[in-house]
Amino acid sequence: MAPRKRFRLLELGSPTHSKRKVQKPLQEKTPNLRVSPLAFKIGKEIKNKEIRKTKKTESENIFNSKHVDLRLESPHPGLNFVSDAQQYSKAGDVRYLKNKSSNTLKNERQTIERPSFDNSLRFEDIEQPPKSTSTPVLSQSSQINVEREAPMFPVPYYIAPSPMYNFSPYQNFVGNPTFLTPSHNPNLNYAIPIQRPELLYPNVNVYDSPLFKKTRLPHQTKSLDKEKNYQYLPIYPVSISNNGDFVGQETPRAAPKLSKKRLSNTLDVNCSDYESSGQNATYNDSESSLN
């Protein structure tokens, strides 16, 4: 009878890791069948020894060890500007090449010297121009123009962009940006205080400016003094005058109307009372008796 096929699970390293059972690859048959089992066993032992040896050397290699000490990368003790030929011939510290326990490493770490710096160094020692007889005296080492490095941190003040080349409709010719609401102005890299709309319309009461629209609240429509109970809503977008020249939309856009079914009392918005005259935009309420 043929021997029963033995099955094993697929190994983790294989490309498709699944629970599917795969046939074990057939072992190579020994060509000489008359070899005594003892000799075969000895050969196997030798092979295992070799494998163990290679494993050991691999573990001694620093990059395979558990605790990699990166100080091995630089065998020199510290920053030495003057190159010392003998210094580079020194071998790396052998203590760290063996795979040691973290405890021993920790103890040894404290015995390592701190990097030594060469204080006797002068500027002339670092860069000397090649001395030749043809070089005039003026361009000797004392006259070398060394470029300054760029500063690490930005200067402590902002250099604001000039409004002349920076013009956008939201800035007047003088260069003062006018904001009706706090907004992000990509042209400016400095902060500007929020301006209230009443400051932009100096001649008029703020609620008479075309920025706001009277709207009655639904629960107030049936009250006795209808005129006094209204809510001020801002109208967007707001047109901004640029020195009397209107930019964008002249007639202020009305807030969206409420459906007549819900609010039968609401008047249609009539914008004819708004007069747009640059900075001095006014609102003439023809219906009110207060004028």
From Swiss-Prot:
Annotated stretches, region: Disordered: 1-30, 116-143, 271-291
Localization, UniProt: Nucleus
GO cellular component: condensed chromosome, centromeric region; meiotic spindle; nucleus
Stretches with biased composition (Polar residues): 130-143
Listed Basic and acidic residues bias regions: 116-125
Short sequence motif Nuclear localization signal: positions: 3-6
Keyword Nucleus tagged: yes
UniProt keyword annotations, A-Z: Meiosis, Nucleus, Sporulation
Major location (coarse): nucleus
Function summary: Required for meiosis I segmentation. Probably acts as a regulator of kinetochore function during meiosis I: required both for mono-orientation of kinetochores on sister chromosomes and protection of centromeric cohesin from separase-mediated cleavage.
Protein name listed in UniProt: Meiosis-specific protein SPO13
Name of the coding gene: SPO13
GO biological process, one term: meiotic sister chromatid cohesion
